[in-house]
Structure formats: C-alpha cells, structure tokens
Amino acid sequence: MAKTKQTLTQLALLVGLTATGLATFTAQADKLAHIKAKAVVKVATFDANPPFGSVDAKTHELVGYDVDFAKALAKSLGVKLELVATNPANRIPLLQSGKADLIVADITITPARAQVIDFSTPYFVTGQQFLVPASGGDKLDDYSKARIGAVKGTTGEQTLHQRFPQARVLSYDDIPLALTALRNGNVQAITQDSTILAGLLGEAPDKAKFKILPELLSKEEIGVGVKKGEPALLKAVNDELVALEKSGDAAKIYDAWFGPSTKAPQPRSFTIEAK
C-alpha cells in the first residue's frame, strides 16, 4: 500500500511538472497570441538617432524610418503600438526582460547577436560607400587605383586596403576633414558608413558638387529583433515586411527619410526579400 501511494505521488509530481513545463513553454512560445490578447505591441526604438528614430521638435512624438515600420507592423497585427524609447545598449535587454516585444531600432544582424535573439529578414541595408565629385565615375572599381580618404582606425580604412590594394589610402581624424581633402582635390573619393555620408552631404553647402555611389563596399543588414523561441511572431513580422515591399510601401517609407527631398538623401540599394 505504501508502495502504491509512493508510486501515485511520483506520478502526480511528474504530471504536475509536465503541466508546469507545458505552461512555461506555451507562455514562452506564444508571444504573438499574447500581443493580440493584450491588443498592444511594445516596440523598442530610438529616440535620438535620426532619421531612424528621434523626437519631433514640434509634436514631441517619436518619428523616423524605424517608427514607420513599427507602425506598419502594429497595423498588420491589428493592435495598438506602444513605442519604448531605447539606446543601443538597452535594446536587447528590453526584449529579453519582456519590456519590449520587438526591437525596431537600427540593429545590425551579427552572428553574436543572433545567438541571443532572432532576426527578421533585413528591412534596411547599409554599409560603406564612396562620396565622390559629381563628375567622377559611377562604380567603385573606377577608384581602384585612386587616392581615397578614410577615417583613421575604422573598419572602413581596413576594408579599403583589402578591396583596393593598389589604391592610396589617406587617413583622417574625422569625416569632415576627409571631406575637406576631397574638396581640395587631395583625394578622389572618401569612404564611410552610408548613413553618415548621407548626413554629411545633406548638411554640405556645396552638396551639388558631390554624389554618393549606390554600390556598397561593405554590407550591414538591419533586422527586427524578436525574442528566441517565438516562430509565430517572427513569421508574422517577416510576412509583413515582405508585403510592405511588394505593395511599394517599404519604398515610400524609405523615400520619406532618405529620398531626394530629405536632408540626408541616398539611393535605395536593396529590396526586402523573403527569408
């Protein structure tokens, strides 16, 4: 009898642990259902990183490229959007702690980060580009033996030596000094991250004299961050990103923040593709 009771107790304990495990698994793996039940999605985004995310001086609301994508994702899920302001260091902790359901904050997809969180298909692609005189060649290879300015100690400087070993790479302390060298004819091109070059050119009084080549010397893909173990939510995000591309809305969002009429214009050199 004692043995029977012991067996029943063990079975009850096993059933209890199994039920607890299933409940935990369901809670962890059903974030999409939780979002829809709460009718709100919490999205971590920047509040001081234009044009991706910043506070509008007039409305005091968050605006930007990332914000527009966050709005589109919320609309596709049929829920309200709650923006959670963040900085680079806090993006992943906010997601892991449950204070944010998604990261839409200019976060580059890297192998190290992919071990911690899942990423959507890229919705923005950036990388190292060339700023050259308006009359210069339109391809990177046109500058394979040129004098090229780069910022000292950057990965861009290293990439130039690898890609164009016959080029003469001149290093500068910052990108404004490199632009001055380009203006003076000391170099035939300068290189830096595409968004930085776009901002630099946008503020230049003589911007008509220069152009940014659309081809990327290096490539960095930006994706939406999703907590590990949420395949349904990840699929919903990917499906909407691809739908935005097919409808043309993704290109419209891009043009609103990086198009010809913006302060930091740069050509769109990518499309959002199914993962």
Predicted features, each with a name:
Residues V67, E82-P93, S135, K152, ...:
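Short helix-initiation/N-cap motifs at beta->coil->alpha
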Residues F124-L131, S194, A198-N238, P260-K275:
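Periplasmic-binding protein-like
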Residues V67-S76, G136, A146-R147, T154-T155, ...:
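Extended ligand-binding regions for polar small-molecule ligands
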Residues K31-D106:
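Extracytoplasmic small-molecule ligand-binding "clamshell" domains
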Residues T159-Y172, L241-K275:
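Ligand-binding clefts/hinges and TM-proximal coupling segments of bilobed small-molecule sensing domains
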Residues G53-A57, A70-V79, G156-D173, L201-P205:
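Ligand-binding cleft/hinge of the Venus flytrap
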Residues L32, V132-I148:
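Flexible hinge/capping segments at coil-to-helix
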Residues K75-S76, V84-A85, A89-L102, V116-D118, ...:
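Short helices/loops that flank or line small-molecule/ion binding pockets
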